[in-house]
């Protein structure tokens, strides 16, 4: 029996070492236990939802043949604000003739922005023939003013990875400009990127676009042109154009004169860095203090491993100042088709510096415009702190979307970013960015919640009003989920150990409360950085007699306590002790009474004895597991990098040197006959005229030598 237990223990431990589950989550909630509101649109056909705009009270959602106006508080539809726009029958039939399905040949709204006060521009796929309409708000409803072609602004396919951002009534878009999707471009009428120029755009998948300073930034992933000599690989990029770029002189009027791009480096450092190369989503630009007194503007990005690799996801933060610095740095150039991409010498860069924002780019010299066409690639953008702030390796899911509730205030006047991360299996992770004071790293505390009932991928995430509320957008469903889990904790210890800046323990009410519901922090207990619960009261099973200055309170405590005379001090089930002053809860130290040294009586009941028996049984079981672990440890060494969620490959070039012979199989010092213990039932081989024992060309060490033979 003991042997069986030992064997099963070893197997269990080996299985755990083979694949460690995601045990870092503080709290895991099932879909049914999450408070949420749902919106399903037509609930029959695919909608391909996308959030077009959001304000303090409403959220505009693009779907199949219409724009929905939803309340951001409960996702109820304001039908007076709905805009219907189906494709015409002619466009639908032409789409069917091109080989598309009926679901493809609909008008999926992808773009909405305000061109001027009181007017909206809406663009849709329109059965693979993009169109844009201008709506004017008159007499309480939106009326169509004009309709124009949307090629270059809106994608043909609702599932195509496109992005757009408006500035000063103009739309900057990143999409494709043909039916097949083979002409990607970054466009603002009339300027666009070069046609069929792989050095500018090479099969990109656009993720997000933001306006910052004098520039519009685009985040995307594409096939790396600088790696083509070695194979095919995907790199993450950030590209920029000037907001007021008017194009170049002469034939370059419809081309950008400020387009530059750089690789986003998200890697785990080491002798051979491990890269997360495929960007999936970015947050908005947020501002805060991260391990310094200076305020920084950063943007969070989700980057993953390729789809055919082991599932790995990482979150890297990039400082906007670093991105701007890279675009002011060295240009990269390939001398010949077989050359490496190297920095361009400074003396070969024309003046004024190409790619800068100028008042009128149409008067730039031709050499500047031509230089920027062929030298759009810059050096890499480093991640903040030089490494990801969160890494997750999982066979079950990958990160797909991210949004940030920036600089949430704690009761200790700390400001921390709360991140919401969507996955491709319908879950939302809540993570807290906790800067460490003396290290260049960020710690995270994570909570995982299942939001979509059928595991549909999360496409978008948006912050909603209220602590912990987030809008989760899927392909055919939108949910307003409350990821504030304060009320689920009933003990001070559990509440504090959540390390959630939204939650704190109210010592006055004995409740785990959301901070936005209280008016005073006086009685709150919270420790987001360490999760230290020393400030908590003892569990309710421990009866404490608290003596305060008020006589009425003293009488109440004496009345509710157990008389010491009625207890037998020799009874081993009775424990008497004195509380130390250090155990006094600071929250209870008020101006009225304060804390006093008091006697603590603890009585162990029958329930306590049952718990002791269970604990002893569990300890006995784990003793067998520990024995198995000891045996297993002899054959399984610990990871050299216990804190890393991956195993870094170290390929030492000197592995065959003298000091590395320990890795090689020792050579035999004498000849070994490998044919031993041949079964008698084995048929004897046929005799020939080659008697090995008579072959003098076989050396004693067993090495065969080439000989000449003559056959008659």
Swiss-Prot record:
Residues in Sema domain copies: 21-483
Biological process (GO), any one: axon guidance
Signal peptide region: 1-20
Intracellular or extracellular location(s): Membrane
SUPFAM superfamilies (UniProt xref): Plexin repeat, Sema domain
Pfam families xref list: PSI, Sema
Name of the protein this chain belongs to: Semaphorin-1A
InterPro entries: Plexin_repeat, PSI, SEM1A_sema_dom, Semap_dom, Semap_dom_sf, Semaphorin, WD40/YVTN_repeat-like_dom_sf
A Gene Ontology molecular function term of the record: semaphorin receptor binding
Recorded name of the encoding gene: SEMA-1A
